[in-house]
Every structure is written in structure tokens, then in C-alpha cells.
């Protein structure tokens, strides 16, 4: 739009800058979520995916994907803490359905059911809750091998009794054949703080550029309104 006096106002430019700032705010939110999750067990970072049409779609052109790379594995000394060196997810039966998670901090109840920290059953490769055939005197009598096979020491027979395999699957629900299970370890997030901080810079720079466009167009709009008022 141009009126007498040569003042130009681009409505589309203002709308585009608003949409862009909205998208960049959401991207910053994802980065902040990743940084916040740095020290969380089983946390996986989110990667923003920006559509080629985001300029027109705004926030509807933004999506995200989960980075499924393994995180940092650290010893915990708790035999019921289970981590995976390869990709995959444990299956947990919740009231809302089966949940996939990398958080392998488990515990036993009084009858030998293997549970997560929220008392939800851990599922086997057969899709059933894992229950130990005998109740161990302590957690050190529970053995989990690299394939995810769970066993428990039976004092009476002096041998290990099988309790099944952990139901480890990929994001599509397909069985993972070589999860490389680590007993007595926790897996912390796969977030690399340096990468997240580096990712902030271009987002902030783009946000500031669009903010300047918005302020310029907003100023021009005020001038247009003022001149239209003077002409009436």
C-alpha cells in the first residue's frame, strides 16, 4: 500500500514477520527443552523440522522429530538400573497403553513383578509383565544379560531361573535383536549442550531480523493511519 507522501506499508510483510517470530519462538522452546533435559535419565532431544512453506504456514509448518541416538551411559551400582548401548526402547504397560522409554530405572514389588518408578509393569518380548519365578533376597541376585534376558538366583536349587526377555523394540514396535543391555547403568540424555547453544545463535538472529521488519512495518502503518485521518 502506498499513499500520498510516498509512505509504503506492506501488510504481507508484517504478517510474515509475525509468523516467522512465532516459529522461531517455538524452535527456541525446543532447544530450551533439550537443555533442561540434559541430566534426565532416558531423555531424547527433539530436533525441529521446518517446512519449505513455513513462510506461509507459520507455526503449522513446524514439526519435530526425536533424535534416537543413544545417550550417555553412567554406572549406578543398582542391579535394577538397566541401560542400552544401542537404539531401542523398553515397553511399559501404563493405564493409557504401552509406553516406549529409554528410562530403565526399575524396581521389584513384594511378589517379584518388575516395575518402573511409577509402579507400571515392565513388559517382556511376549508382551506380558515380567515376574520373577522366585523372590530374590536382594537385587544383586537378579541378572540381566546383553540380550535383555532376565534371570534370578534360586537359593534352593543354586541356579539361575529364567524370567524372560525384556521387550525391547524400535520406534515402530519391531523387536531389537541386539540392544546391548548394560545392567547397573543409567542412560542420561543424548543432548550435547555445545550443539544446543550453537543452535540458539541463528534462531535469535532471525528472530531479531523479523522483529525489526515488524517494527518498521508497524511504524509505517501508524503513519498510514495518521495520513488517512488527516485526509478525511
What name fits each language-model region?
Residues 1-232:
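Amphipathic alpha-helical polymerization modules
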Amino acid at each position: 500500500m502506498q499513499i500520498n507522501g510516498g509512505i509504503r506499508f506492506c501488510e504481507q510483510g508484517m504478517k510474515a514477520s509475525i509468523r516467522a517470530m512465532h516459529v522461531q519462538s517455538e524452535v527456541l522452546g525446543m532447544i530450551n527443552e533439550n537443555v533442561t533435559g540434559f541430566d534426565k535419565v532416558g531423555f531424547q532431544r527433539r530436533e525441529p523440522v521446518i517446512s519449505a512453506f513455513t513462510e506461509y504456514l507459520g507455526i503449522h509448518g513446524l514439526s519435530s522429530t526425536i533424535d534416537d541416538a543413544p545417550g550417555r551411559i553412567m554406572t549406578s551400582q543398582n542391579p535394577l538400573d538397566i541401560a542400552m548401548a544401542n537404539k531401542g526402547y523398553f515397553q511399559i504397560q501404563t493405564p493409557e497403553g504401552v509406553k516406549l522409554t529409554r528410562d530403565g530405572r526399575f524396581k521389584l514389588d513384594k511378589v517379584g513383578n518388575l516395575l518402573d518408578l511409577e509402579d507400571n509393569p515392565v513388559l517382556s518380548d511376549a508382551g506380558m509383565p515380567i515376574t520373577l519365578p522366585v523372590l530374590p533376597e536382594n537385587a544383586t541376585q537378579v541378572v540381566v544379560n546383553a540380550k535383555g534376558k532376565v534371570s534370578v538366583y534360586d537359593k534352593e536349587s543354586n541356579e539361575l531361573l529364567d524370567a524372560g526377555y525384556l521387550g525391547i523394540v524400535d520406534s515402530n514396535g519391531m523387536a531389537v535383536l541386539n540392544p546391548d543391555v548394560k545392567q547397573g547403568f543409567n542412560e542420561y540424555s543424548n543432548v550435547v549442550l555445545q550443539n544446543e547453544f550453537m543452535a540458539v545463535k541463528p534462531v535469535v538472529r532471525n528472530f531479531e531480523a523479523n522483529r525489526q521488519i515488524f517494527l518498521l512495518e508497524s511504524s509505517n502503518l501508524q503513519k498510514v493511519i495518521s495520513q488517512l485521518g488527516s485526509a478525511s
